[in-house]
């Protein structure tokens, strides 16, 4: 018997995956956020993701306002190694092995680091071509996450999904995410997620269908392959 959890069937997922994927990639290319859901038997959370290349202050404000406030920058290992960002802990015992590094702030151009403007400044400093360890300091108010090699074909997490989608869109393999939350502090799911997506005009994808799409095309998760796998 298959252990694959089916993609949820409700209006957010009513359109065929190929249609939603193309819309999602178009949105990412112009700096609009996309909803990415993981499996029901995993975190069962909806994250708002945006391509780091296209991040703007208004979208960052939306992530902070409508999400948990923990804004994460998802990057391949080679980028984090160039920035010399070590893991947050020596032994990762979190339930889903979420690979946080130490938190960061831009060395220049920020005040307290908390505002939407400051967090965008930090992310731009971290993903700039040729960025090095001296361009960011720790601790800070942006939380980098190390995406596993192979992307969602290796680990079915929002971290890997956001990096894979950015690469599929032809952008730098770097994503920014924040978990969506309701006003009462509960995670946004079901009807509340439907209402939010309709109000904001957002497209939704599920990690299981993204993984199936990449596997069907023989992609290995390498950014160069993903750029032509859409």
Swiss-Prot record:
Keyword terms, alphabetized: Lyase, Magnesium, Manganese, Metal-binding, Riboflavin biosynthesis
InterPro entries: DHBP_synth_RibB-like_a/b_dom, DHBP_synthase_RibB
Catalytic activity entry: D-ribulose 5-phosphate = (2S)-2-hydroxy-3-oxobutyl phosphate + formate + H(+)
Cofactor(s) recorded in Swiss-Prot or TrEMBL: Mg(2+); Mn(2+)
Residues reported in the UniProt entry to bind D-ribulose 5-phosphate: 42-43, 47, 155-159, 179
Residues the entry annotates as binding Mg(2+) 2: 43, 158
Sequence positions that bind Mg(2+) 1: 43
Pathway annotation: Cofactor biosynthesis; riboflavin biosynthesis; 2-hydroxy-3-oxobutyl phosphate from D-ribulose 5-phosphate: step 1/1
Gene Ontology terms for molecular function: 3,4-dihydroxy-2-butanone-4-phosphate synthase activity; magnesium ion binding; manganese ion binding
EC numbers for this chain: 4.1.99.12
Residue(s) at site: Essential for catalytic activity: 141, 179
Cofactor binding description: Binds 2 divalent metal cations per subunit. Magnesium or manganese.
Coiled coil spans: none
Cellular component GO terms held in the UniProt record: cytosol
GO-annotated biological processes: riboflavin biosynthetic process
Matching PANTHER family: 3,4-DIHYDROXY-2-BUTANONE 4-PHOSPHATE SYNTHASE, GTP CYCLOHYDROLASE II-RELATED
Subunit (UniProt): Homodimer.
Similarity section: Belongs to the DHBP synthase family.
Chain's role: Catalyzes the conversion of D-ribulose 5-phosphate to formate and 3,4-dihydroxy-2-butanone 4-phosphate.
Protein name in the entry: 3,4-dihydroxy-2-butanone 4-phosphate synthase
């Amino acid at each position: 018997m298959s252990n694959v959890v089916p993609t949820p069937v409700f209006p957010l997922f009513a359109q065929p995956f190929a249609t939603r994927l193309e819309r999602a990639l178009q949105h990412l290319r112009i700096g609009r956020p996309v909803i990415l859901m993981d499996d029901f038997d995993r975190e069962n959370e909806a994250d708002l993701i945006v391509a780091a290349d296209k991040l703007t202050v208004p979208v960052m404000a939306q992530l902070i306002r409508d999400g948990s406030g923990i804004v994460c920058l998802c990057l391949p290992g080679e980028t984090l190694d160039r920035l010399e960002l070590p893991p947050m802990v020596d032994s990762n015992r979190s339930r889903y092995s979420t690979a946080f590094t130490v938190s960061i702030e831009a060395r220049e151009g920020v005040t307290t680091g908390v505002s939407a403007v400051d967090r965008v400044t930090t992310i731009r400093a971290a993903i700039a071509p040729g960025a090095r360890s001296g361009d960011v300091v720790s601790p800070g108010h942006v939380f980098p996450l190390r995406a596993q090699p192979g992307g969602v074909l290796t680990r079915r997490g929002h971290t890997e999904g956001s990096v894979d989608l950015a690469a599929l869109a032809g952008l730098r393999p770097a994503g920014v995410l924040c978990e969506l939350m309701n006003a009462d502090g509960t995670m946004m799911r079901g009807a509340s997620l439907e209402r939010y997506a309709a109000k904001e005009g957002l497209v939704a994808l599920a990690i299981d269908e993204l993984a199936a799409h990449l596997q069907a095309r023989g992609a290995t998760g390498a950014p160069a392959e993903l750029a032509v796998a859409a």
